[in-house]
Amino acid sequence: MLVLTRKVGESLLIGDDIEITVLSVRGNQVKLGVNAPKNIVVHREEIYHQIKALADNIPESV
């Protein structure tokens, strides 16, 4: 795992198309902005796991 330190207003670039910017920090909460192409799906981890669990419970059609 790559670990980085960023300040408010600083960004992290992933590839050529994805930019993650630190918007604010309050206590133990960090607000991030994600700028990515519309074809890139972005979810919070807990939402991703909910979607995956729902998809795993859907029976495959024959």
Swiss-Prot record:
| Primary localisation category | cytoplasm
Q: Which InterPro entries match?
A: CsrA (IPR003751), CsrA_sf (IPR036107)
Q: Which GO terms describe its molecular function?
A: mRNA 5'-UTR binding
- Name the Pfam families for this protein: CsrA (PF02599)
Its cellular-component GO annotations read: cytosol
Where found?
Cytoplasm
Q: Mind listing the GO biological process terms from this record?
A: mRNA catabolic process; negative regulation of translational initiation; positive regulation of translational initiation; regulation of carbohydrate metabolic process
Mind telling me which Gene3D superfamilies this protein's record contains?
Translational regulator CsrA
Could you list the residue ranges that cross the membrane? none
Sorted alphabetically, which keywords does the UniProt record give? Activator, Cytoplasm, Repressor, RNA-binding, Translation regulation
User: Coiled coil where?
Assistant: none
Q: Which family does it belong to?
A: Belongs to the CsrA/RsmA family.
Q: Which NCBIfam families match?
A: csrA (TIGR00202), PRK01712.1 (NF002469)
What is the role of the protein in this entry?
A key translational regulator that binds mRNA to regulate translation initiation and/or mRNA stability. Mediates global changes in gene expression, shifting from rapid growth to stress survival by linking envelope stress, the stringent response and the catabolite repression systems. Usually binds in the 5'-UTR; binding at or near the Shine-Dalgarno sequence prevents ribosome-binding, repressing translation, binding elsewhere in the 5'-UTR can activate translation and/or stabilize the mRNA. Its function is antagonized by small RNA(s).
What is its quaternary makeup?
Homodimer; the beta-strands of each monomer intercalate to form a hydrophobic core, while the alpha-helices form wings that extend away from the core.
User: Could you tell me what this protein is called?
Assistant: Translational regulator CsrA
Q: What is the lineage of its organism?
A: Bacteria, Pseudomonadati, Pseudomonadota, Gammaproteobacteria, Pasteurellales
